[in-house]
Amino acid sequence: MAKLLLYLTLATSLIPLFSVAFSPENPTDRRVLVLVDDFAIKSSHSLYFGSLTSRGFQLEFKLADDPNIGLQRYGQYLYDALVLFCPSVERFGGSIDVASIVDFVDSGHDLIVAADSNASDLIREVATECGVDFDEDPAAMVIDHINYAVSNFDGDHTLIASDDFIKADAPVLFQGIGHSLNPANSLVLKVLSASSSAYSANPKSKLSNPPSLTGSAISLVSVVQARNNARILITGSLSMFSNRFFRSGVQKAGSSIKHEKSGNEQFLTEISKWVFHERGHLKAVNVRHHKVGESDEPAIYRINDDLEYSVEIYEWSGTSWEPYVSDDVQVQFYMMSPYVLKTLSTDQKGHYSAEFKVPDVYGVFQFKVEYQRLGYTSLSLSKQIPVRPYRHNEYERFLPAAYPYYGSAFSMMAGFFIFTIVHLYSK
Amino acid sequence: MARSTGKDAQALFHSLRSAYAATPTTLKIIDLYVGFAVFTALIQVVYMAIVGSFPFNSFLSGVLSCVGTAVLAVCLRIQVNKDNKEFKDLPPERAFADFVLCNLVLHLVIMNFLG
């Protein structure tokens, strides 16, 4: 009987632990749905999936046209992130379609989309909803006759070795379609772009007119961070994630350096960390403001008060919240336009504070912190506070500018007094 | 012509001085008092011209105290002057009492308006 009770309490106390996934306290995604064209991808891309599971993700593999798949049930989302490794799917099964994927992202969840040279219209549509446009020619691939990787079996220079980014040990192998970004879109970012000698065309047929996508306007890998901090990774090469590319060595044509291992594994591991909110995720807590010298938060300020504003910002390290250190966080004292804009100073432990004087204008203000930096979630804090003018007895009693007038009035009184004495008592 | 106007001005000034020396001391004291009030008023106007009229009520109060004092003193001088035929029957004590009362009211108003 006691043992049963023990097991029961243990079981019930562990239930909340199982549900702590993707909460504000732990922003890394946990449950990931991977949609594939066929389950062979599970084994041919096992190194990539293995790296994800070793970091604690629960992957669920389903065929893209499986009629039982669904992102949500009874209004609750079943997964924290979605990976679409199904470039040739014509129609999603179950309750998934482009609209439900867009809703999934709109509710703050992350997405990885990998297309390939036989990408269907559906995948292209999903990518367009996210802000990138794949090349419209269905048979086009990215070709680069200068930066291609030397290999035994490819003769058409579609296997590209790209090293147009910083801090990778070896170039990244890419074989697939390219996409372009709208330069007016401020949310989408090119992570890996093709070199200026690349173009997007059908490798098997002769070029009849100049290709529409050329040079470094072609993006090979892009990321999007939405305004609700959902992150999307879009790439045109599913084979970039494959074991074959992970393991193969790279030798760029024309150079004699032969790298033992391509940079694919390192690059994709790091970028998956970013997409699934293991890095670059900020939270701001403990917004406080008070008059200098006091410690409790007043409900209203007076003009020309000295006040102090403080906030704590932490960055998620994958396992815990570390203090975020930066010198460019600013606070605005805002009413229709910022009256005060001050850079917060930090004590290097995540505590930011600033002191300033309330402006000489009364009204309802807001303390606003708008912090958007490349690679980090955007912080948008706002706290409303009214500001009142002086009460009638808070003005200065005697104005220094009027001292001569005070003096003259009193001197007239004194003069009058002396004059009466003199006038009365003189002969 | 200029020399004669210069000489005329000098002659005028001399006759004025000698005539003024003949006035009674009492009146001279009142004249001194009026001069003091007007001088103080001028100082305040120059100060306002330099610094600006910010507490305008204080400026008005200060200037008007000087001007009011001068005006009341002039009234007293008129009423007390024995050569003045209009106020021959007015006792100088009555004139002085009026002067004191009016000054009291003036200073009450000035103190209120000074701010």
UniProtKB/Swiss-Prot annotation, chain B:
Keywords: Apoptosis, Endoplasmic reticulum, Membrane, Transmembrane, Transmembrane helix. The chain crosses the membrane at residues 32-52, 56-76, 95-115. InterPro entries: DAD/Ost2 (IPR003038). One of its GO terms (biological process) is protein N-linked glycosylation. Its main location: endoplasmic reticulum. Pathway: Protein modification; protein glycosylation. Residues 1-31, 77-94 are cytoplasmic. It is found in: Endoplasmic reticulum membrane. GO terms for cellular component: oligosaccharyltransferase complex. It is a multi-pass membrane protein. Residues 53-55 are lumenal. Belongs to the DAD/OST2 family. Subunit of the oligosaccharyl transferase (OST) complex that catalyzes the initial transfer of a defined glycan (Glc(3)Man(9)GlcNAc(2) in eukaryotes) from the lipid carrier dolichol-pyrophosphate to an asparagine residue within an Asn-X-Ser/Thr consensus motif in nascent polypeptide chains, the first step in protein N-glycosylation. N-glycosylation occurs cotranslationally and the complex associates with the Sec61 complex at the channel-forming translocon complex that mediates protein translocation across the endoplasmic reticulum (ER). All subunits are required for a maximal enzyme activity. Component of the oligosaccharyltransferase (OST) complex. This is Dolichyl-diphosphooligosaccharide--protein glycosyltransferase subunit DAD1. It comes from Citrus unshiu.
